[in-house]
């Protein structure tokens, strides 16, 4: 299985453990608008480069990317591939923090991160939209385990990161039921919205987070 998350290139491919994971999603009956925030902390004793691998559904498209390495904040900017590589290498030579986004599979994309100093906090926020597909009047939305994995205790000690999953479902009047076969939920309601959070605190996903939305309405996919 591929390792997702932050992988240190010049440190024997070890993975930098997570500190915080937040998933914030707004769903209607055809589209999910999702933001994922992940924070890492590099405790090494020398500057390193790293790659960050993020799982992505074939039905999804990235819309926003924001990376903060220490006090340096880098916002995503679309460039032609050759220009982007030159820009990345130029900043690395200058000693500046930089990143290069490179999609390498249908279900995953990869970001190269450069010049990460010791005792540095790295935060990554990714926004994406995803088609929601309906089968027998049920929409199933999933947050994969790889967003917030459990690390082996002998490598990192007991998991210390914090996980939050917050979901808002629009068009409440078209929905008959919402449930999760994977995790206990708590619900609140406001106007025509359903707001959902995990009902108990967890530190990692030992299984995919699955949300089933039951409805009686025709659904049209937005992303073509």
Segments from the language model and where they lie:
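Subset of Sec-pathway N-terminal targeting signals
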Residues: 1-224
């Amino acid at each position: 299985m591929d390792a997702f998350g932050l992988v240190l290139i010049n440190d024997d491919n070890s993975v930098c453990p997570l500190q915080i994971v937040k998933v914030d999603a707004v769903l209607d009956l055809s589209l999910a608008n999702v933001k994922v925030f992940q924070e890492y902390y590099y405790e090494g004793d020398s500057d390193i480069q790293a790659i960050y691998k993020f799982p992505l559904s074939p039905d999804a498209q990235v819309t926003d990317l924001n990376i903060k390495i220490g006090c340096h904040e880098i916002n995503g900017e679309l460039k032609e591939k050759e220009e982007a590589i030159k820009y990345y290498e130029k900043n690395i030579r200058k000693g500046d923090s930089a990143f290069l986004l490179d999609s390498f599979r249908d279900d995953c994309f990869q970001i190269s991160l450069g010049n990460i100093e010791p005792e540095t906090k790295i935060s990554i926020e990714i926004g994406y939209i995803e088609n929601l597909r309906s089968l027998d009047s049920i929409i199933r939305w999933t947050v994969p385990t790889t967003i917030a994995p459990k690390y082996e205790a002998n490598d990192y000690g007991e998991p210390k990161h914090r996980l939050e999953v917050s979901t808002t479902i629009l068009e409440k009047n078209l929905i008959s039921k919402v449930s999760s076969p994977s995790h206990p939920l708590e619900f609140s309601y406001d106007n025509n919205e359903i707001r959902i959070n995990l009902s108990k605190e967890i530190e990692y996903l030992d299984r995919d987070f699955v949300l089933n939305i039951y409805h009686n309405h025709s659904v049209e996919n937005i992303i073509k």
